[in-house]
Amino acid sequence: ILNQFISFMRDGSDEEPQETNVNTLLQELVTQFKPLDIRFTPQELPLIQARSMSLKRLIGNLINNSKRYGAEPVELSAQIEQDRLLIKVADHGEGIPEDQIEDLMQPFVRGNSARTVQGSGLGLAIVKRIVDIHSGELYIHNGPEGGLEAIISLPIHQAEPEQTATPTTLDKIRQSITGHF
């Protein structure tokens, strides 16, 4: 749990944005998670400005959640819609009760069915934080035929991800703990 908490505090806001090939990043994750059955077909995508390591961590967390709480195969895709890059991670598990989805993006919150699986309750909070740093949006919902779908929507035509004053680690710890005690 301590490692997850430290990971939550290191949200990537200090990482420099760089040109990122999303297809390459996704293919690296497919390889990293072998032998997990991940279905991914690269599409023609532009390079985007992103914090590459943080983006990889974000998508890796979603794949890991699919592995732990969902069922194979995991479907991974990226496509352009209007001026947005949409990255989707979907599994074929049971999904999550709709009334729990929003709460799961808060630190230390776990779903009812996840209580039998070891975890910290920080995975989706880390995902949400990294999406916010990239000026993106995160949509999580149950798929029409079961399973859970997470869609990350990132702007394509931005100079670079959101620049905010980087809080110190102590500030982050205070902010995170204050809301939970």
Where are these predicted regions, by residue range?
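Short beta-strand/loop element within the Bergerat-fold HATPase_c
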Residues: 73-83
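Conserved catalytic submotifs in the C-terminal HATPase_c
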Residues: 39-47
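Short alpha-helical Gxxx[C/S/T] motif in the catalytic ATP-binding
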Residues: 123, 127
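Conserved glycine-rich
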Residues: 72, 135-136
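Conserved micro-motifs of the catalytic ATP-binding
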Residues: 11-15, 47-50
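Short conserved segment of the HATPase_c
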Residues: 96-108
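Acidic ATP/Mg2+-coordinating residue in the GHKL
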Residues: 91
